[in-house]
Structures are given as structure tokens and as C-alpha cells.
Amino acid sequence: MGARMDYGKIWIDGHVHEYADAVVGPMSHSLSYASSVYEGIRAYRAKPLLLDLHLARLRKSCEIFGHRFPYTDTEIGVACAQLMQMHSVADAYIKIQVILDDSGYGFQGKECKSK
């Protein structure tokens, strides 16, 4: 088995973590039922391009799936800037992914927490 790739720092539940510390449980709703939603955003000169439109689309996807997305556009913008600074990059591809954990059960995952 190959070595796990190290992506440095990531942002989970409002906090910066080491990529190696990120864990998605094997029984998480998103892994079991492919119920995650994500948005890919390009950043140039340390500014995410059309961030407001990307986040509006992400929120709509979360609404359709019944996921909770508790962060404001400002909080996400600050997190993006913080991570780009930590990685010393100005141009980047940012992926925001919302998953449901393993705190609930059932096909719809209504009791599961969004992460």
C-alpha cells in the first residue's frame, strides 16, 4: 500500500487541523450512501473567484440533501485565506465538502450531523 499523501492543513468544523488527523468513519452516512456535497473554487492572487456564487450553490445543494451548513460566507472566506496563507499559495483549487457523520442512522440521515 502506498504512502498517504499529506495535504498539510485542512479546515474541519470551524478549526484548522493536520490533514493526517482527518477521519471519516466507515459507517458515516456520506460514505455509506454517497450523500456528501462539495464545491470546487479557484483562487487567484489569494482571492477565491466568485466565492459568493459558489457558496450559494453549495447552500442550495445542502438544502436539497437536507444537510446543515452553519458557516457564513465571511467565515468561509476567512478560512480560505487562512489556509492559503498557511500553505504559502496565492493560486489554488479549494474544495469545500459537506458530509454527514455516523451519529444517526437510516437512509435519509436526518439525525446525522453535517461536518
Residue positions per predicted region:
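Conserved alpha/beta cores of soluble small-molecule-handling proteins
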Residues: 1-115
